[in-house]
Regions:
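Conserved signature/switch motifs of ABC ATPase nucleotide-binding domains
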Residues: 6-9, 27
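Hydrophobic anchor residue at the start of the ABC signature
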Residues: 21
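Catalytic Walker B motif of ABC-type/P-loop ATPase nucleotide-binding domains
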Residues: 32-35
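Conserved H-loop
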Residues: 61-67
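A short, surface-exposed alpha-helical micro-motif characterized by mixed small hydrophobic
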Residues: 74-76, 99
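Conserved ABC ATPase "signature" C-loop
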Residues: 86-87
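ABC ATPase "signature
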Residues: 92-93, 101, 172
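The conserved cystathionine-beta-synthase
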Residues: 134-157, 161-166, 171-184
Length: 184
């Protein structure tokens, strides 16, 4: 508001980033390419821009190719991640899969400092349907393990039921395995 007459070079870094994203959307691309779109921003503005990016992605439903050297950013924003080394893809998969099952030693080292419970969803370790037949105290499959850690720690059942967003039981998780990821 009030900056319509300014050139991009006259704007702050965060404002320039917003203008760049708006310009890239103006042509309504089928695939949206973003190369380090948040790299020049301070941490607070960066987080706000990431939140806005997630909101726009949900609203527009665009396929987005997002290039970043910030693995935490990739984990937060991506449905699929490609980790590259020397111009070759080492692994291309979901954040869950990359963190739980690194394909190469390079990927393992790349992910070893990541707090798995912050990345891994309940559904990533869920067994479809199975022993957990009851919906009593079921947990949502789309939740991160860190978000259900208290439930996992206090629930004595070996298998905890998992439900989808329609509250239908879709499977179960092994509590011990989940706790190993949370505290391992």
């Amino acid at each position: 508001e009030g900056r319509e007459e300014y050139f991009p070079r006259e704007l702050s870094g965060g404002q320039q980033q917003r203008v760049g994203i708006a310009r890239s959307l103006a042509i309504e691309p089928d695939i949206w390419f973003l190369d380090e779109p948040f790299s020049a921003l301070d941490p607070l503005i960066r987080r706000e821009m990431q939140d806005e990016f997630l909101r726009l992605q949900g609203l527009l439903g665009k396929t987005i190719v997002f290039i970043t050297h910030d693995f935490d950013e990739a984990l937060r924003l991506a449905d699929r991640i490609a980790i590259m080394k020397d111009g070759m893809i080492e692994q291309c998969s979901t954040p869950d899969e990359i963190v739980l099952n690194p394909a190469t030693e390079y990927v393992r080292k790349f992910t070893e400092e990541i707090e798995k419970a912050r990345v891994v969803t309940v559904e990533a370790i869920m067994e479809p349907l199975g022993e957990a037949k009851t919906s009593t105290n079921a947990i949502y499959g789309n939740k991160k393990l860190k978000d259900v850690a208290k439930i996992l720690a206090s629930d004595a059942r070996e298998f905890i039921p998992v439900k989808d967003n329609n509250d239908q039981i879709v499977g179960h998780i092994n509590r011990t395995m989940a706790l190993d990821i949370v505290f391992g």
